[in-house]
Amino acid sequence: AVPCATWLDGLSEGEQAIDELLGLLIGKGAAALNVIPDRNWNIADPETRHLKVQKLHAIAKMAGALDLPLNVGTEMNSPGNRLVDDFAAPAMAPLNGAFMAGAYFIYGHTVLQSTRGWGYQSDWARTHLPARRARNAFYETAGRRATPGEDRMRRLFDLPSASSPDAVLNALAYDY
């Protein structure tokens, strides 16, 4: 698992001291930040929408500066919410790159953890990728390359257990 800090909307007392809060959570092991974007832009009141969109953009920028990939999604446990976020909405479009990078990061971690036990928190990752920025970049790249398919997964299984990150990415490389 990738320990995720969470962010609601930046309005609570704790989230108003977000630098301090994220510093504490990173110190406790948080490696990504979970946000639910829809509740921060899909709001009828224009003033509230403007404020929450500003805060959403600010937290996305801060997450990037702190090397915290963004994990985004909807609140499917609440009636009336979307099944999938609308990343093309004007308020969301500027964040699309960060949202997709976070999705690839999570997918890369999931593929490598489930196939080889080489997920983000693994001994393998800590040995080969001790710096958070390099580790994040590796798992994002792995996620971009890890297209579904038996052949690609077999290549991962065939790697020696002491394989380097470059060898792993090469095993996931496109065939064309």
Where do the PLM segments sit?
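Charged catalytic cores and adjacent phosphate/nucleic-acid-binding surfaces used
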Residues: 1-176
